[in-house]
């Protein structure tokens, strides 16, 4: 059987980046599409394959015992493959044995529990924790904040393309203002150092770098919580700073909650 997996996956990556999906989404979609191809013995998915998708999703549920959310993510990746990359919509995917949705009660922390978690965080992680619990930001929203999104005068935070892909504003908690100012001053020094080294670029949304070539190095567009290292992967263009990785925050908060 003909296998054109690597070339196909490169096309998938290009389609994802053209739509400015997150790196996490890219990694997940590429992984699921690769597993799908392997499941079908390296057969290139050149034609619409609703039955092939159904078989794969059923296998995930019955043999791999994946969760409902994992199965749904796999389906989303495969629909993206056929509709956005191969331009061959599959229509309705039927006769799938669905993974069971676990019954979970939402975890809602009391004010005392939130205060306890925050008391075990410090530095950047404390600021992020304050924005998560005090400003009601989701983790992804918080880490994707740009310098320009923070309005100290109005005590507001602009959330771009938040939940439901909608823009909104939320209140900047007064308790975090001074610490956030100090933090951003440090970030600015980091950015100025990058500029002196010939860098200082940041990834921009919606292809703004093509419309405004200088925006990628502008202070206003820098991430409020940048990663400690510069990404030099050529697939992402010139060396750039991404935001802090979600896992670093998740680990810090989990450790604080266990204390």
Give the label of every model feature segment.
Residues 1-259:
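Conserved catalytic core of the tyrosine transesterase superfamily
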């Amino acid at each position: 059987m003909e296998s054109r997996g690597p070339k196909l996956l490169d096309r998938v990556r290009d389609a994802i980046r053209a739509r400015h999906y997150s790196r996490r989404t890219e990694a997940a979609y590429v992984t699921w599409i690769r597993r799908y191809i392997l499941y079908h013995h390296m057969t290139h998915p050149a034609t619409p394959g609703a039955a092939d998708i159904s078989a794969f999703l059923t296998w995930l549920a019955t043999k791999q015992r994946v969760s409902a959310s994992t199965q749904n993510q796999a389906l989303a990746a495969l629909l993206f493959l056929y509709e956005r990359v191969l331009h061959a919509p599959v229509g309705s995917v039927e006769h799938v044995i669905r993974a069971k949705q676990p019954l979970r009660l939402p975890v809602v922390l009391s004010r005392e529990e939130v205060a306890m978690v925050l008391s075990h965080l410090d530095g950047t992680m404390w600021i992020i924790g304050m924005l998560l619990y005090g400003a009601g930001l989701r983790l992804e929203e918080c880490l994707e904040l740009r310098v320009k999104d923070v309005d100290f005068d109005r005590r507001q935070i602009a959330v771009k393309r938040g939940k439901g892909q909608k823009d909104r504003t939320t209140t900047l908690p007064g308790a975090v203002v001074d610490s956030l100012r100090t933090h951003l001053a440090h970030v600015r020094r980091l950015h100025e150092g990058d500029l002196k080294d010939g860098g200082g670029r940041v990834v921009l949304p919606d292809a703004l770098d093509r419309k405004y070539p200088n925006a990628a190095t502008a202070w206003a567009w820098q991430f409020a919580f940048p990663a400690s290292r510069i990404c030099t992967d050529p697939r992402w263009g010139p060396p750039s700073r991404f935001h802090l990785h979600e896992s670093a925050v998740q680990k810090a908060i989990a450790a604080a909650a266990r204390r």
